């Protein structure tokens, strides 16, 4: 039986991330404004920027879903209504919401815009699907707390509904993101997009001992201590690239990548890996192994990767032995002469370092030191570009395009806290 490929839905926290998602193979992007989209830290799109972003995506054949998935208080509703009224004229392909009040307002103020239910709504059973279907929701993002079999059962029970599955990115400590830690500790409510992620902070326990009396087949809590502090609450990140064929057979309409606060380099690498894995999932070819995809994603990872609740027993991914992450070293901006490209450095780039091009399709041609030359913004030959500096790289790369990225090879990548993932 042949299964159609699900839509690949990538995050677009800003213009660069939008361009990266489109260039590296997303079928659709999700974005929001500067408020009420659950990502107050990302710049988002407002006014003319939003209209231009939607038009840009549509010219590339990419759909755009607008996030209004915060859980607003009464004082926020006028702003919600204003945003909803503008969506039809802007041409948004869908609205992502979680709050029943927002969904009801959307049905009245922008009935032509397709309604998608956010993961914040925590949809885990058939009765909930029936309810959301009755109030006009077309697509439901299934809760990360569901396993493969439970998701498959819901997808097959409701063939007239679209279902979306998160396959990669951060997982919240609490149920479907309904966390109060940030609001309690820092007066920054996560459900209004202001999460400070205190679950990722490092803590030191004073006179604290944790034991679990029943489960004695291993540690209840694995704590790694660095400089006397530990990230005791931080969940691992989700990574389901290894199971692409299984997920395609489940029949979801879309696969979602988390990361609206991430960099353009992150979006490029993660989108490229999942786009390539999806394309290969529709064939019997094994051009790239599952281990290779996981290794590629470790270049973007800031936390351990795992299968979450997808499998009955969680699988934790381990990087290959002696693995070193490749930092993104530059973004390509525009052509500069016959063999040159104007670039912006994202990490320290020394001209005696090997590098590799990030070409769509998981193609990673190597640039050996000596096969390319760097210039600063004045056109002078240089041995080093620092983060934020613009310059020119001269190289032989006919497949390179504006918006693509270059990263260092591991054996030559200097450690730098400034390096972009």
Segments (PLM) and residue ranges:
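Surface-exposed amphipathic alpha-helical tracts and adjacent flexible/coil segments at the periphery
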Residues: 1-23, 28-30, 35, 54, ...
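Glycine-rich, positively charged N-terminal anion/phosphate-binding segment
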Residues: 39-55
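Short beta-strand elements of ligand-binding domains
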Residues: 66, 97, 117-119
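Gly/Gly-Pro- and Ser/Thr-rich, intrinsically disordered tail segments characteristic of DNA damage-repair
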Residues: 78, 113, 117-126
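Alpha-helix capping/helix-boundary segments
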Residues: 101-102
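Conserved phosphotransfer cores of two-component systems
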Residues: 110
């Amino acid at each position: 039986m042949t299964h159609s490929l699900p839509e690949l839905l990538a995050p677009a926290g800003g213009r660069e991330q939008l361009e990266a998602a489109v260039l590296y193979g997303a079928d659709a992007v999700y974005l929001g404004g500067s408020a009420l989209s659950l990502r107050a830290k990302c710049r988002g799109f407002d006014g003319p920027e939003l209209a231009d972003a939607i038009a840009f995506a549509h010219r590339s054949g990419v759909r755009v879903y607008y996030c209004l998935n915060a859980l607003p208080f009464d004082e926020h509703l006028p702003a919600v209504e204003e945003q909803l009224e503008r969506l039809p004229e802007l041409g948004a392909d869908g609205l992502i919401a979680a709050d029943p009040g927002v969904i009801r307002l959307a049905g009245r103020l922008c009935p032509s815009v397709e309604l998608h239910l956010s993961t914040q709504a925590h949809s885990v059973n058939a009765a909930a699907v029936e309810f959301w279907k009755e109030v006009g929701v077309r697509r439901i993002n299934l809760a990360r707390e569901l396993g493969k079999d439970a998701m498959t059962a819901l997808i097959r029970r409701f063939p007239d509904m679209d279902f979306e599955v998160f396959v990669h990115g951060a997982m919240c400590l609490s149920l479907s993101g309904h966390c109060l830690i940030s609001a309690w500790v820092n007066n920054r409510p996560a459900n209004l997009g202001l999460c400070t992620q205190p679950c990722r902070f490092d803590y030191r326990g004073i006179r604290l001992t944790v034991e679990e009396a029943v489960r004695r087949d291993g540690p209840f809590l694995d704590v790694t201590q660095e400089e006397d502090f530990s990230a005791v609450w931080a969940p691992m990140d989700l990574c389901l690239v290894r199971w692409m064929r299984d997920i395609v057979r489940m029949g979801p309409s879309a696969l979602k990548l988390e990361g609206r606060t991430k960099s353009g380099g992150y979006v490029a690498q993660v989108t490229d890996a999942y786009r390539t894995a999806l394309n290969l999932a529709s064939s019997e070819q094994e051009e790239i192994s599952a281990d290779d995809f996981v290794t590629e994603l470790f270049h973007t990872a800031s936390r351990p990767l795992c299968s979450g609740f997808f499998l009955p027993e969680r699988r934790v991914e381990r990087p290959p032995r002696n693995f070193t992450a490749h930092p993104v070293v530059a973004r390509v901006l525009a052509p500069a002469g016959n063999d040159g490209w104007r670039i912006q450095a994202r990490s320290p780039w020394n001209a005696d370092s090997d590098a590799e091009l990030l070409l769509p399709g998981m193609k990673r041609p190597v640039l050996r030191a000596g096969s390319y030359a760097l210039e600063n913004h004045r056109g002078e030959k240089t041995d080093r570009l620092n983060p934020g500096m613009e310059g020119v790289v001269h190289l032989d790369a006919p497949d390179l395009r504006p918006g693509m990225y270059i990263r260092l090879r591991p054996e030559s990548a200097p450690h730098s806290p400034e390096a972009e993932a």
